[in-house]
From Swiss-Prot:
Taxonomic lineage from the root: Bacteria, Pseudomonadati, Pseudomonadota, Gammaproteobacteria, Pseudomonadales
Active site residues per record: 38 (proton donor/acceptor)
Entry keyword annotation includes Hydrolase: yes
Coiled-coil portions: none
Organism the protein comes from: Pseudomonas aeruginosa (strain BWHPSA011 / Pa011)
An annotated Gene Ontology molecular function: metallopeptidase activity
Gene this protein is translated from: cap3
Enzyme class: hydrolase
A matching Pfam family: Prok-JAB
Protein name, as recorded: CD-NTase/cGAS isopeptidase
């Protein structure tokens, strides 16, 4: 499968670009077989006006809860990486959002996904929307979720 690196919001006002290493992390955790559990982590990168460069995706840790149809990220490990990147970059690299896998070709968010995204977005200190990515077997689902109201869904840019 080939995941695209550049994406645009449905209104074309926001662009995203995923680094090669971020896309490789997604590829390594696709739920290709019936026994594969969901995986996920944080999305770290930089903000450029309304646009974002996603430079790193943390990988599941031993503390995370992973099941076929559920991933629960525990703070241990992920937050330490985010803080280290933020400190080393003097605040340039920040926590932009979260990613996780679904065992389906073309993923869509569940009700649980939506409620979790809304909760995470509402508690952000910087008041920016949360970037939410679901990695399917053949495609990505990408949405920028504000603290309240409707989010922006992204499509690949050729």
């Amino acid at each position: 499968m080939q995941f695209m690196s550049s994406w645009a919001a449905d209104d074309n006002r926001t662009l995203l670009h995923f680094s090669k290493s971020t896309l490789e992390t997604f590829r390594q955790h696709v739920q290709a077989s019936d026994s594969d559990c969901e995986a996920g982590g944080l999305l770290l990168g930089s903000v450029h006006g309304t646009h974002m460069l996603i430079e790193h995706a943390t990988v599941p840790t031993a503390w995370d809860k992973r099941f076929r149809y559920l991933f629960e990220r525990m703070p241990f490990g992920h937050e330490a990486i985010a803080l280290a990147r933020w400190t080393a970059s003097q605040g340039t690299i920040r926590h932009l959002g979260e990613w996780h896998t679904h065992p389906e070709d073309n993923p869509n968010p569940s009700g649980l996904d939506r409620s979790e995204w809304n909760r995470l977005s509402a508690k952000r200190r910087d008041k920016r929307p949360t970037l939410a990515v679901i990695v399917g077997r053949n495609a990505l689902y990408i949405e920028l979720v504000p603290g309240s109201g409707q989010g922006s869904v992204f499509s690949p840019v050729e």
